[in-house]
């Protein structure tokens, strides 16, 4: 693990014009995972479609290298319904995939990103967050339990998923 100074991280929001490096980074992450099936395959057209649907993709840069990334996805009515929560879906975001470069794992970057993006999400008008994580993805579930409450487990597309909830106004314990 390479140590880093989180104070030197630069957060950038990706646009349609700067997705190529992110796709290479995503493929590196997927190849380095013990179970790459936790991640779907992505393409530039898919990411462009997400951005056009008001999703936000953030990369965290350290010494010119993407070391971590996260997505903020607007929830739809169905996602909020599946959660079992009685919330206005316009106020709910879904945390999309969060990745950490293999050389920088162990620096608590996933936790750092969630706390950092909480302020971004509040500025975008969101009040609540939902995270859906494959039940077998132990590392991501352990991180999610630090910033959210496990509210239910569902079966979606033949996979067992844990659903976490976070009230963005109150943040997370650090």
Show the residue positions of the predicted features.
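Short amphipathic alpha-helix that is part of the acyltransferase structural core
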Residues: 2-44, 59-61
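Glycine-rich acetyl-CoA-binding "A-motif" of GNAT/NAT acetyltransferases
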Residues: 65-68, 139
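A short, internal acetyl-CoA/4′-phosphopantetheine-binding micro-motif in the GNAT/acyltransferase core
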Residues: 87-88, 95-106, 133-134
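Conserved acetyl-CoA-binding loop-helix of GNAT-fold acetyltransferases
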Residues: 97-100, 106-119, 142, 146
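C-terminal "cap" of GNAT-fold acetyltransferases
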Residues: 155-174
């Amino acid at each position: 693990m390479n140590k880093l100074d989180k104070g030197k991280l630069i957060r950038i929001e990706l646009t349609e014009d700067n997705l190529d490096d992110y796709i290479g980074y995503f493929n590196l992450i997927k190849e380095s995972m013990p179970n790459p099936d936790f991640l779907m395959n992505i393409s530039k057209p898919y990411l462009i479609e997400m951005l056009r649907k008001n999703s936000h993709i953030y990369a965290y840069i350290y010494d010119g290298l993407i070391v971590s990334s996260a997505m903020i996805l607007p929830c739809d009515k169905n996602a909020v319904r599946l959660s079992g929560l009685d919330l206005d879906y316009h106020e709910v975001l879904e945390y999309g995939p969060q990745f950490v470069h293999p050389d920088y794992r162990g620096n608590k970057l996933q936790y750092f990103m969630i706390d950092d993006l909480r302020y971004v999400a509040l500025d975008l008008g969101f009040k609540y967050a939902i995270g859906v994580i494959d039940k077998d993805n132990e590392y991501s579930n352990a991180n999610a339990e630090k910033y959210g409450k496990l509210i239910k487990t569902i079966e979606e597309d033949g996979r067992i998923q844990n659903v976490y909830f976070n009230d963005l106004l109150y943040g997370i314990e650090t």
